[in-house]
């Protein structure tokens, strides 16, 4: 064993220590004891020697890492017919890792708080919608714990290491939730807000002012059950019947829309972050809704959505004027981000609303425009969720089942960014570039698959009560 003693072991913290075979045999001892297996000292010593033989080829410059030695222990135990002992060793190895992480976490709590208070961590300003405040500190602290949970308890080492090494970036690790979602405004109008046992339930809104208040509360609640944007589609189409039913004047309509816009720009997540919200405005009544009876107060009215074009124009005018005016200091509103559908039926004439729309666009650059001219898609085929996600419902309809592919209630489980510049920098040939990319794409896809399973399980178990209610009740 004299030759073996010359090798050095590189520890996880980078320190180098002399190789000692006794540490291998001690770990194998514990694995056999855990399974209550009979063994002799000679057998343990023999297995230890086989381990040293197994990792010979891994030694570089007379050095080998702890992880490489542990991999060899697992291989040798399995090859020797002790698969159950190997499993016990793997669990022992994982437990040791958790203990190390726990020690690190205990030491890091002070650093986590100080890095936020002293603005030393880039994450303090990662989200432009979060204000530096005690509420932001609460989000930062809980986010650090949750991110560590994802990386140490849920994702496997390959995924966690790829994120820690910046080969990929897994977004929103600070929240144990899905990414973004689009919700059925029709369902909210039909059923009201609530449905959670033991909590206050609101009846379907009968007036525009009440509906605007319910939408603000709904988006604020959903922001706490999802990491990213929350969206409503056909905003102007669904709100117009409330204007018609109460024969509201334009000043009354504008007052309601103002309350909605101010409401969704008020911080509601720990008092520090406004809901990231997106609304799609049809501008003209879409074909899939035109012939349907309008709904107010949860009941069908004696008129259809196509009969509410004048009221739609009032909704759109009130929304755009409020966005142009900004707040009391003249500052533009961040939310909601409006998306407008441009179809062959879009009226390009010099109307008041058209002038206002493009004035808002030129002043703030706020709206997104979905171009359906010369397209085989219709506005009803697309749901805009946020600044980087648009879902093609035609593709979702090909999928069967699942909480994330059912009509209007659609969304995204998560987002992963691949570090393409690093791949390009490290690759010497196009072939190497694509090989590296393939590997990271597989890792990214697996991380999203794992996240989908975890979020689906937590949804079933009731961790997201309002989302569960709106995803499972009939519409």
Residue spans of the language-model regions?
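Charged, amphipathic alpha-helical regulatory modules used
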Residues: 2-106
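Conserved catalytic cores of very large enzyme subunits
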Residues: 98-99, 105-471
């Amino acid at each position: 064993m004299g030759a073996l003693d010359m090798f050095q072991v590189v520890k996880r913290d980078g320190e180098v220590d002399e190789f000692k075979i006794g540490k291998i045999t001690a770990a194998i001892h514990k694995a056999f004891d855990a399974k209550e297996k009979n063994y002799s000292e000679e057998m343990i010593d023999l297995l230890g020697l086989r381990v040293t033989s197994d990792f010979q080829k891994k030694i570089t410059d007379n050095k080998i890492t702890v992880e490489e030695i542990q991999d060899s222990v697992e291989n040798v135990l399995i090859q020797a017919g002790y698969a159950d002992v190997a499993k016990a060793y793997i669990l022992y190895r994982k437990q040791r890792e958790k203990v190390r992480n726990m020690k690190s976490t205990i030491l890091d709590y002070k650093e986590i708080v100080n890095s936020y208070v002293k603005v030393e961590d880039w994450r303090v300003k990662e989200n432009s919608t979060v204000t530096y405040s005690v509420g932001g500190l609460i989000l930062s602290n809980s986010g650090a714990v949750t991110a560590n949970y994802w990386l140490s308890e849920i994702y496997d080492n390959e995924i966690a290491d790829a994120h820690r090494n910046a080969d990929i970036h897994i977004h929103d690790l600070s929240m144990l939730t899905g990414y973004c979602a689009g919700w059925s405004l029709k369902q909210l109008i039909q059923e009201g807000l609530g449905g959670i046992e033991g909590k206050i339930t609101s009846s379907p809104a009968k007036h525009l002012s009440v509906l605007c208040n319910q939408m603000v509360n709904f988006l604020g609640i959903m922001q706490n059950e999802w990491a990213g944007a929350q969206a409503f589609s056909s905003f102007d189409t669904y709100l117009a019947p409330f204007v018609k039913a109460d024969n509201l004047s334009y000043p009354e309509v504008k007052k309601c829309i103002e309350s909605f816009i101010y409401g969704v720009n008020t911080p509601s997540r720990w008092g520090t972050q406004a809901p990231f919200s997106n609304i799609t405005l049809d501008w003209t009544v879409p074909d899939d809704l035109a012939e349907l009876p309008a709904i107010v107060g949860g009941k069908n009215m004696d008129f259809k959505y196509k009969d509410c074009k004048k009221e739609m124009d009032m909704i759109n005018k009130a929304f755009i004027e409020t966005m142009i005016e900004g707040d009391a200091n003249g500052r533009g509103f961040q939310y909601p981000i409006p998306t407008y559908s441009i179809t062959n039926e879009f009226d390009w004439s010099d109307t008041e609303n058209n002038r206002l729309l493009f004035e808002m666009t030129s002043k703030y650059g706020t709206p997104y425009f979905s171009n359906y001219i010369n397209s085989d898609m219709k506005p009803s085929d697309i749901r805009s969720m946020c600044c980087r996600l648009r879902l093609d419902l035609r593709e979702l309809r090909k999928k069967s089942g699942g909480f994330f592919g059912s009509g209007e209630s659609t969304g995204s489980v998560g987002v992963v960014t691949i570090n393409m510049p690093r791949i390009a920098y490290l690759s010497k040939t196009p072939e190497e570039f694509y090989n590296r990319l393939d590997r990271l794409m597989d890792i990214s896809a697996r991380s999203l698959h794992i996240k989908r399973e975890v979020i689906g399980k937590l949804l079933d178990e009731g961790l997201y009560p309002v989302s569960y209610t709106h995803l499972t009740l009939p519409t």
